[in-house]
Structure formats: C-alpha cells, structure tokens
Amino acid sequence: MQQLRVYQSLWAMERRRPDGHEWTLEQKLAMIRDAGFDGAGVRFFDRDYAREVTAFLREHGMSWQAQCYPRSVDELKPIIEHVQEFGADHINLQADVRPYTLDECIPYIEGWRRLADDAGIALHIETHRDRMTTDLFFTLQLLDRFPDLRLTADLSHYVVGREFAWPISDENHALMHRIIDSAWGFHGRVASREQIQLQLAFPQHQQWLALFMQWWEYGFRSWRRRAPADGVLTFLCELGPPEYAMTGADGYELSDRWQEAGIMKDSVRALWQGCANEEVGQEARKEAAQKKTQVAAAA
C-alpha cells in the first residue's frame, strides 16, 4: 500500500527570538514525536548531529530524510557514507552551485546521481532559490535534459521567484504541473507572489493557501499514478524561522509556526486520504459495472 509520511523540519524548529530563547534538541525531537509527525528532515553534513537525531527517531519508530547542500560532486560522498551508516528514506539535495548554462549543470547532476545509484540510495534534487534550480524555466530545461530527474518540489520558491500574477494563469499552472509531475517528495510552505512564507490562518492569505492545497492534491494524484504499490511519499513541513517568518516591530513573529506546522500536517494527511478514498470508490464502481455487464451477458 502506498504511504504518505509527513515530516517536520528541524531547521524550522529554530525560533530566533529577540530574547534568545531556543528549544533544546531533545525538546524539539520530543515535540515532533508527541505531535504525531512520522519523522523529521535532518541535516546530514554533521555526522555527530545526524547520529544523535537518527538514534532518537529510530528508537521511537520514526523515519527521516537526509538533507545536504553540496558544492561539488565529491561533497556528496560523506553524506552517502553517513546515510549508509545511519539510514534515511532518501537524500534531499540542494545543489549549492549556480551554473549559468545547462551544459555546466550536466556534470553535477550526472555525478551526484551516479554516486547515489552506486550506493543504492534514492536522491531527490530540491527546487530552491539561489541554487541550481533557482529559476523555473531553467529547471524545466533540466527536466528536458534529464526526464527522469527526481525532484523535491518546494513550490513556494517559484511562486515568489517569478512573482506569479493573481489569478494564476493556465500557462503558469501548466508549468508548475510539469515540476510537480517530476516530484517524488514535497516541502511544505505557502507563498504569495511577493512573500515567501505566509501565515496559514490569516484571512487575507486563504486564496494562496487554497492554491497550494490544490497543487499538492495534484501532486499526490500524480505521484500515486507513477509510484509503485508499496511506494512512500514524503511531505516535509518547513515553515522557516525569521527571516522566512514575518515579524513585527518588536522582532517577534506574527503567528505560531509550530501550531501552523501541526495544521499543515493534518491538512495534507486529510488531502492524501481524500485521494486514496476516491481511488477506492472508483475501483469499487468499476468492479460493480463489470459485474453488472457479466450478469447481463449471462442472461
């Protein structure tokens, strides 16, 4: 049976408050566990950190994605070694390089994929500003060159990066659908055309929240068609700290991001279940129609 695993970003557990108060790592992990997340997004460039975090998650029956930011092909090698040691359901790679031409990208993509394939580890390339995938059109050209490239789709970066006009045009929907159709995981954040991260409950943001829910639903359906029967899709709630999060004049945030992460978790799980239920209903109707046809033929 296909599964959805909803993770919480450990980076998003940073508070960066004016008073300097931060949760300890132990508190963060316990909060993620107690809130019912399936796991966490874990930065894997620090071996000791990865070991500590994954030990906790494993002990509590949770899983994780290994996050990394290589600036060369070789910089992925220690990440792979850490994943081989500690495990991960996949590597999420932010390509911390900015080639000007598509041809300059090819050695990076081919090198990273070769290393991951040789190690038998799934590799997803994240869509993100100030990375190789910073521009929507450039990333679409990457997909032209590598049609089987597996993306982690953080759609917020393209909405604000290209400053999509509202309402979203059919053309822009089609471009985003093409990104989504290559997505094997999602990072969850809601943007507008001029803000990278919106508060989920504010009334003035509901049209953008609805848009992202629509795209994620499309993505779930797309993935379910492409993935194997026992496949696992990951969705990382990644509501970042300031300066991703908006703050008031006092430096404190305008909303409770931890509470919002829980809302996002529940919302995407409901979205996933709705897709699954609809597929079950369609299959039941199909079987009923076939039986009706067989009965009619026998008569």
Role assignments for model-derived ranges:
Residues L10-A12, D46, P70-S72, A95-P99, ...:
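Active-site-proximal loop/turn and secondary-structure-junction residues that shape catalytic pockets
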Residues M1-R5, L10, E14-K28, R145-R150, ...:
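Histidine-acidic metal/acid-base catalytic patches
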Residues G41, A66, I91-N92, T152, ...:
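Conserved beta-strand positions in the central sheet of alpha/beta enzyme cores
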Residues S63-L151:
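Active-site acidic/histidine proton-transfer and metal-coordination neighborhood
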Residues T24-R47, H82, F86-G87:
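Catalytic domains of carbohydrate-active enzymes, especially glycoside hydrolases
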Residues Q27-M31, R51-A55, E59, P78-E85, ...:
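Alpha-helical scaffolding segments of alpha/beta enzyme cores, especially the outer helices
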Residues I32, A40, V83, L123, ...:
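Conserved, mostly hydrophobic/aromatic
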